[in-house]
């Protein structure tokens, strides 16, 4: 449960079906279903995307796989892995960084320390 994740109107339904959604996600992940990070739910505020990482890992996904679901795995599902999803020469990349390693502690993703888009640094606190 993440406080204030859902508006009051949606909260009762979310509390009822939330555990079922988590269980379904866990089953899909364990079965090898390809999972892309993101949502079109329309109930989450912009900038709260980091909470999805917490939900994914709480449902049994490894931290590393959760991070990959937001990068290379989504690029593969969209069939753009030749230009997106990795940091290497020739690829398009917007980069974010954290003070701590999110593979070791996924909750660190809520504190972005560095943002670079199209080669321009928009935030740098490290």
What residue spans do the PLM features occupy?
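Small/polar (Gly/Ser/Thr/Ala-rich) solvent-exposed segments
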Residues: 104
